[in-house]
From Swiss-Prot:
Keyword Magnesium part of the UniProt annotation: yes
UniProt biased composition (Basic and acidic residues): 693-723
Gene name as annotated: pnp
Protein family: Belongs to the polyribonucleotide nucleotidyltransferase family.
Organism: Listeria welshimeri serovar 6b (strain ATCC 35897 / DSM 20650 / CCUG 15529 / CIP 8149 / NCTC 11857 / SLCC 5334 / V8)
Region called Disordered, residue ranges: 692-723
GO molecular function terms noted in the UniProt entry: 3'-5'-RNA exonuclease activity; magnesium ion binding; polyribonucleotide nucleotidyltransferase activity; RNA binding
Keyword check for Ion transport: no
SMART domains in alphabetical order: KH, S1
Protein name as annotated: Polyribonucleotide nucleotidyltransferase
C-alpha cells in the first residue's frame, strides 16, 4: 500500500475523496479525507499485545489546528494547547459508534488520531474525521467489525437535509448527528426546537440511509487496499473455573442484587464477592494473582447476567421498580440566599444542585476555535465530585465526561433561553452533582430549569430530561425508564431524552451492542415522552413560572438606543467620557455597534443616573424647543448657555431682551439659570438661542419705535485681505 490511491464519491452535493497509501504509512491504517475544502488526516494504531486490565483501552483524539482556518492561536505561547471543549466533544462523538464494534474480550490498545488540516465551514470536519476513523480501522490489520459512518441531519420547512451548510443550519429546527453500520444505528446526538418524537425518528432514519451508502463506499476501499486482520487472542474465562465460581456464588448473588437501596445492595454484592475471593486466597495457588483477577471478572459477569435475567425475564429491576417506573421525585428552589437563582432536584438517589448566575453581556464566553461562532452568552457547566458516589480521590480539571454532560444540558436548554433583545444577560448555569445513582446529567437539566425560574429568567418553557435503558437478550428486549447506575453499567443502551411538554430539545444515545432497529428507537422515544411529562408535572408544581423580579443581588440591566454616530461622544477621547460615567455611578456599560447601550448595576438608582447622563450627551436640540440652562461663559456679543451636558448655545446680546441691552452683564451673570428658546441650528451644528422670545413684548408709542438692528450671532472670522 505504498502507492497513493484515491477513492471518490459525492456527499451532500460536495466531492468526498479518500486518499490512502501516501501519508502516515507507519500507522496500522491511515486515510486522508477531503470533503469540499475540508481536509482531515486520521491514523489508527493497535498494539501487538494485550494491555493489563479488564477493559478495552481505546483512545480517540481529535486535534484542531488553528492554521486550518487561517488563525494564529491566542495566548502567550501562540501554539495549540489543551483540546477545546469542541475538540473533546468531537473525540467522544467518534469514540461512541466505534467502541461497540470491537469484540468482547479485546484488550489490545487502540489509538485513533484525527488531525484537522483545512476547514471549509460548510463541510463538517467532525463528520470527515468520523469517516476517516472508520476507514483507517477497516483498511488496517486491527480486528474491527465496521465500517461505520456518521452524518449530520437538519430539517428546513419540513424537509430533511444531509450535512446542512452554515446558512441551512441556522434555519433548521433539528441539529442531529447520527452514526451506525449498514444494518443499524448505534449513536445519536441531537439538539432540536421542540420537535415531535415522530419527526426526530424520521430524521434518524433519513440519516441512516446516507450511512448505508457511505458504508458501501468503504467496502470498495476495503476490497482494494484492506489488510488481512491479525489474529488476536481475546480474553476468555477458563470454563472450569467459571462453572466452579458460578456454582458457589450464583444463588447468593441473586439475593444480593434484589436489595433495593443502592449502598445496601453494593455492600451485599461486595460481601458475596469477598467471600468467594477469600476462599481462593486460602488455597494458596501458584498463580494466585492471575486466578484472583479472573475470579473477580467472573463474579462481575455473574452479577451482570443476573441483573439482565431479572429485568428481561421477571420484568423486575434491582430496586423493585417496574420497567417504566420513575424513582421518587423531590425539588426545591431558592436554597442559596445570595445567588441569583438555585434549584435542587432529587430523583431517587441522584441529586443535583443547579445555580443560575446573571451577568452583563460583556461577560460572555469568547470562542476561539475552528467554527464561525465568536461568543456565547449561555453556558451550562456540570461538576461530578467523587463524594457523590461515596468515593475518595484527587479532584482534577473537568474531564471528557463532565464536559460532555455539561454540553448535553446546554443543548437541552438552549432553545428555551430568551433572546438577547428580550433578556440582555449572560446566563451561566452550574450543576453540582451531590449524589449519583444514574441519570445525573438529566437531573442537572431539571435542576437548571428550576434555577432559571428561581432567577427570573423568562424561559419559553420548562425542560426536563430522562435517561432510558435497554436489556436485549436475543430478539427479546426490555426498555427501562429512568435507569440507575447498575442498569447503565450492565445494560445495552443509555438513551437520554430532554424536552418540554411540546417536544424534544436534546437527545443522546449510546449503545454497547451492534445497533438498534427502528422499532426499538420508536418505543424508547414514546416511553421517554411519558416519563418526561411526568417529571415536568413535578417541576411545575414546585415553581410554575419565572419570578417576576430578579434577585436583589443580580445586576439590573437597562437598555438605551442611541444613534451610531453618537457612540464616539459617549465614549469620549481615549474613553475619558465613558470612564467618567462608570466612576461616577459604579455601573457597567456595554455599547454595541448598532447603538444599543446596556447599563448594568445592582443599584437601580445608579442605572437611572447613568441613563440620564448618556441621554444628555446624545441629546440633540430641536428648533422651537425651550430649555433651562446655566450661563457658562460671557462675551461682549452674548452669553453661552449650557442646555444639557455637552451641549451649549449662544444667546446673542440682541436676543436677551426686547429693549436695547448695553452690556450682557446687565441681564445675565456667570452661573445664572436662564430659560431660553432654540431659534436656529446652523449648518455647522451651532445653536442660537433667544431669551426675549419667551418674554412679553412691551408696547411702545408709535413715535418711539426704532428700526431693529440686524441680528448677529456667532461672530464670523474676517477673511485675510489679499495683498
Amino acid at each position: 500500500m505504498s502507492e497513493k490511491q484515491v477513492f471518490s464519491t459525492e456527499w451532500a452535493g460536495k466531492t468526498l475523496s479518500v486518499e490512502v497509501g501516501q501519508l502516515a504509512k507507519q500507522a496500522s491504517g491511515a486515510a486522508l479525507i477531503r470533503y469540499g475544502d475540508t481536509v482531515v488526516l486520521t491514523a489508527a494504531v493497535g498494539s501487538k499485545k494485550p494491555r493489563p486490565g479488564d477493559f478495552f483501552p481505546l483512545t480517540v483524539n481529535y486535534e484542531e489546528k488553528m492554521y486550518s482556518v487561517g488563525k494564529v492561536p491566542g495566548g502567550f505561547l501562540k501554539r495549540e494547547g489543551r483540546p477545546s471543549d469542541r475538540a473533546t466533544l468531537t473525540a467522544r462523538l467518534i469514540d461512541r459508534p466505534i467502541r461497540p464494534l470491537f469484540a468482547e474480550g479485546f484488550r489490545n490498545e487502540v489509538q485513533i488520531t484525527s488531525t484537522v488540516f483545512s476547514v471549509d465551514q460548510d463541510c463538517s470536519p467532525e463528520m470527515a474525521a468520523m469517516l476517516g476513523s472508520s476507514v483507517a480501522l477497516v483498511i488496517s490489520d486491527i480486528p474491527f467489525e465496521g465500517p461505520i459512518a456518521g452524518v449530520d441531519v437538519g430539517r428546513i420547512d419540513g424537509k430533511y437535509v444531509i450535512n446542512p451548510t452554515i446558512e441551512q443550519a441556522e434555519k433548521s429546527d433539528i441539529s442531529l448527528t447520527v452514526a451506525g453500520t449498514y444494518d443499524a444505528i448505534n449513536m445519536v446526538e441531537a439538539g432540536a426546537k421542540e420537535v415531535s418524537e415522530e419527526a426526530m425518528l424520521e430524521a434518524i432514519m433519513f440519516g441512516h440511509e446516507e450511512i448505508k451508502r457511505l458504508c458501501e463506499f468503504q467496502q470498495q476501499i476495503i476490497a482494494a487496499v484492506g489488510k488481512e486482520k491479525r489474529e488476536i487472542e481475546l480474553f476468555v474465562s477458563d470454563p472450569e473455573l467459571e462453572a466452579e465460581v458460578k456454582a458457589a456464588s450464583e444463588g447468593k448473588m441473586k439475593v444480593a442484587i434484589k436489595t433495593e437501596e443502592k449502598k445496601a445492595r453494593e455492600a451485599a454484592i461486595e460481601e458475596v464477592k469477598e467471600e468467594i475471593l477469600e476462599s481462593y486466597k486460602a488455597k494458596e495457588l501458584e498463580n494466585e494473582t492471575e486466578i484472583l483477577s479472573e475470579v473477580a471478572h467472573i463474579l462481575e459477569m455473574i452479577e451482570k447476567d443476573e441483573m439482565r435475567r431479572l429485568i428481561s425475564q421477571d420484568k423486575i429491576r434491582p430496586d423493585g421498580r417496574k420497567v417504566n417506573e420513575i424513582r421518587p421525585l423531590s425539588s426545591e428552589v431558592g436554597m442559596l440566599p445570595r445567588v441569583h437563582g438555585s434549584g435542587l432536584f432529587t430523583r431517587g438517589q441522584t441529586q443535583a444542585l443547579s445555580v443560575c448566575t446573571l451577568a452583563p453581556l460583556r461577560e460572555h464566553q469568547i470562542i476561539d476555535g475552528l467554527g464561525t461562532e465568536e461568543y456565547k452568552r449561555f453556558m451550562h457547566h456540570y461538576n461530578f465530585p467523587q463524594f457523590s458516589v461515596g468515593e475518595t480521590g484527587p479532584r482534577r480539571a473537568p474531564g471528557r465526561r463532565e464536559i460532555g454532560h455539561g454540553a448535553l444540558g446546554e443543548r437541552a436548554l438552549q432553545y428555551v433561553i430568551p433572546s438577547e433583545e428580550d433578556f440582555p444577560y449572560t446566563i451561566r448555569l452550574v450543576s453540582e452533582v451531590l449524589e449519583s445513582n444514574g441519570s445525573s446529567s438529566q437531573a442537572s437539566i431539571c435542576g437548571s430549569t428550576l434555577a432559571m425560574l428561581d432567577a427570573g429568567v423568562p424561559i419559553k418553557a420548562p425542560v426536563a430530561g430522562i435517561a432510558m435503558g435497554l436489556v436485549k437478550l436475543g430478539d427479546d428486549y426490555t426498555i427501562l425508564s429512568d435507569i440507575q447506575g447498575m442498569e447503565d453499567h450492565f445494560g445495552d443502551m443509555d438513551f437520554k431524552v430532554a424536552g418540554t411538554k411540546d417536544g424534544i430539545t436534546a437527545l443522546q444515545m449510546d449503545i454497547k451492542i451492534d445497533g438498534l432497529s427502528r422499532q426499538i428507537l420508536d418505543e424508547a422515544l414514546t416511553q421517554a415522552k411519558e416519563g418526561r411529562l411526568h417529571i415536568l408535572e413535578h417541576l411545575t408544581s414546585t415553581i410554575s413560572a419565572p419570578r417576576e423580579e430578579l434577585s436583589a443581588y443580580a445586576p439590573k440591566i437597562i437598555t438605551l438606543n442611541i444613534k451610531p454616530e453618537k457612540i464616539k461622544d459617549v465614549i469620549g477621547p481615549g474613553g475619558k467620557q465613558i470612564n467618567a460615567i462608570i466612576e461616577e455611578t459604579g455601573v457597567k456599560i456595554d455599547i454595541e455597534q448598532d447603538g444599543t447601550v446596556y447599563i448594568a448595576s445592582q443599584d437601580q438608582a445608579m442605572n437611572r443616573k447613568a441613563i440620564a447622563i448618556i441621554e444628555d450627551i446624545v441629546r440633540e436640540v430641536e428648533v422651537g424647543e425651550v430649555y433651562t440652562g446655566k450661563v457658562r461663559r460671557i462675551e461682549k456679543f452674548g452669553a453661552f448657555v449650557e442646555l444639557f451636558k455637552g451641549t451649549d448655545g449662544l444667546v446673542h446680546i440682541s436676543e436677551l431682551a426686547h429693549e436695547r441691552v448695553g452690556k450682557v452683564e446687565d441681564i445675565l451673570k456667570l452661573g445664572d439659570e436662564v430659560t431660553v428658546k432654540v431659534i436656529e441650528v446652523d449648518h455647522q451644528g451651532r445653536v442660537n438661542l433667544s431669551r426675549k422670545a419667551l418674554l412679553e413684548k412691551k408696547e411702545q408709542p408709535e413715535g418711539d419705535k426704532k428700526p431693529q438692528a440686524e441680528k448677529k450671532f456667532y461672530p464670523k472670522t474676517k477673511k485675510p485681505e489679499s495683498k
